[in-house]
């Protein structure tokens, strides 16, 4: 099993900081970037082989890779997404299908959280995929919400899930077991071929609709933030200094 970080996005709502810099490289704790936090968390749970999907301003991450390897004691594999500025992240994750073929712990490259989330995921192994879910946070219309089946498996994942009936928010971390790799890659391919603007969570829905089993790991009362805009970045800096 490897660590896998999706870091191909541009982060247009964080301009001008991201005009020529991937948002995953934005500093959140001194010189530590969002990507530093993600790599450190994966290393903390014993994953020192890490693939990073790059796209927008890919050269900036490639330039930083040797320093990141030295700092964290890991080996990085860079996976290039040539459509990162045109298509959404269902294609981005599909680009990493060879990297996650033997299983992976997937982390969104714009999420700041403590390593306890990775620990929870690894402690919750059992299904083909396991997604990290915040079941404490009040939900609105913009969150990537989930609804569970009677078996406590993922039934639906989408922003349009009714907040009143939702069972939590997916926070951007997933454990992919080796046996799920090929069917997940197929589901992701079907998803981006249907509509390249779709998210990888739509690929998860396709995987579940085909009979794939997706469990959850409830993260408990944990501070985390998905960095989409300047307000998120300020909050990420508060969270990162406590990670």
Where are these regions (language model features)?
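Conserved alpha/beta core of the MobA/IspD/sugar-nucleotide pyrophosphorylase nucleotidyltransferase superfamily
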Residues: 1-3, 167-243
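N-terminal nucleotide-binding beta1-loop-alpha1 segment
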Residues: 1-19, 26
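Conserved core of the sugar-phosphate nucleotidyltransferase
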Residues: 114-193
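Conserved beta-strand segments of alpha/beta enzyme cores
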Residues: 24, 75-77, 153, 213-215
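Conserved N-terminal catalytic core of the sugar/cofactor nucleotidyltransferase
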Residues: 2-5, 32-103, 194
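A structural signal for short hydrophobic beta-strand segments in well-ordered beta-sheet cores
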Residues: 25, 146-148, 216
């Amino acid at each position: 099993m490897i660590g896998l970080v999706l870091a191909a996005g541009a982060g247009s709502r964080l301009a001008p900081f991201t005009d020529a810099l991937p948002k995953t490289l934005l500093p959140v704790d001194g010189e530590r970037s969002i990507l530093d936090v993600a790599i450190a968390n994966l290393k903390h749970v014993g994953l020192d082989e890490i693939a990073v999907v790059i796209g927008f301003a890919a050269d900036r991450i490639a330039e930083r890779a040797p320093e990141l390897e030295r700092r964290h004691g890991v080996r990085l594999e860079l996976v290039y997404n040539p459509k990162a500025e045109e298509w959404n992240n269902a294609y981005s994750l599909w680009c990493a299908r060879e990297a996650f073929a033997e299983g992976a712990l997937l982390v969104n490259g714009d999420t700041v959280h403590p390593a306890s989330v990775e620990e929870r995921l690894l402690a919750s192994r059992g299904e083909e995929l396991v997604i990290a879910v915040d079941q404490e946070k009040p939900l609105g219309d913009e969150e990537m919400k989930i609804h569970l089946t009677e078996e406590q498996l993922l039934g639906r994942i989408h922003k349009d899930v009714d907040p009143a009936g939702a069972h939590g928010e997916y926070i951007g971390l997933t454990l992919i077991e080796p046996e799920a790799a090929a069917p997940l890659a197929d589901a992701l391919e079907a998803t981006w071929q249907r509509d390249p603007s779709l998210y990888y969570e739509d690929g998860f829905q396709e995987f579940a609709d085909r009979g794939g089993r997706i469990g959850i790991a409830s993260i408990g009362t944990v501070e985390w933030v998905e960095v989409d805009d300047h307000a998120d970045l300020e909050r990420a800096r508060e969270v990162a200094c406590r990670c």
